[in-house]
Design a protein with these regions (language model features):
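Chalcogenol-based redox active-site neighborhoods
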Residues: 1-153
Length: 153
């Protein structure tokens, strides 16, 4: 998967049990971020960063989607505990993470690697972050979208 490639479509349940499809967000920017596990230190830092920058993202017309291999129930607890205003998608079989090259296996244990994909309104991958610092990543992503939107004008 490379910058400029079409982002593979998928449908997954969110923390409310509703089905969420990437194609439903066509026409707007999407931050698709993969993370290893709900309610762990790095994942909480990253999710709370996206929560804190959510209004700035929405003002730019951006939707944020978090994806891990945790269940919708686990996502609901994590989302409720930290007041996360965006969908957390349950990729329990790891197929979507695998599709994006973000699945990590340790024997029988599988996780999503901490990676982020910026998807443009045409459904193409505009930027890929394969190495993510949870503490500074969200601001870096918001700034990148601002620059990409400005360049597209």
């Amino acid at each position: 998967m490379n910058v400029g490639s079409p982002a593979p479509d998928f449908s997954l349940p969110d923390q409310q049990g509703r089905t969420c499809s990437l194609s439903a967000f066509r026409g707007q920017w999407v931050v698709l971020y993969f993370y290893p596990k709900d309610d762990t230190p790095g994942c909480t830092t990253e999710a709370c960063g996206f929560r804190d920058d959510y209004l700035a993202a929405r003002k730019l017309g951006v939707e944020i989607l978090g994806v891990s291999v945790n269940s919708p129930e686990s996502h609901a607890k994590f989302s409720d505990k930290y007041g996360l205003p965006f969908p957390l998608l349950a990729d329990t079989d790891g197929k979507v993470a695998s599709l994006y090259g973000a699945l990590w296996s340790l024997g029988p244990i599988r996780f999503a690697r901490r990676q982020t994909f910026l998807i443009d309104p045409q459904g193409r991958i505009a930027r890929i972050y394969r190495k993510v610092d949870p503490g500074s990543h969200t601001r870096e992503v918001i700034e990148a979208i601002r620059l990409l939107q400005h360049a597209a004008k």
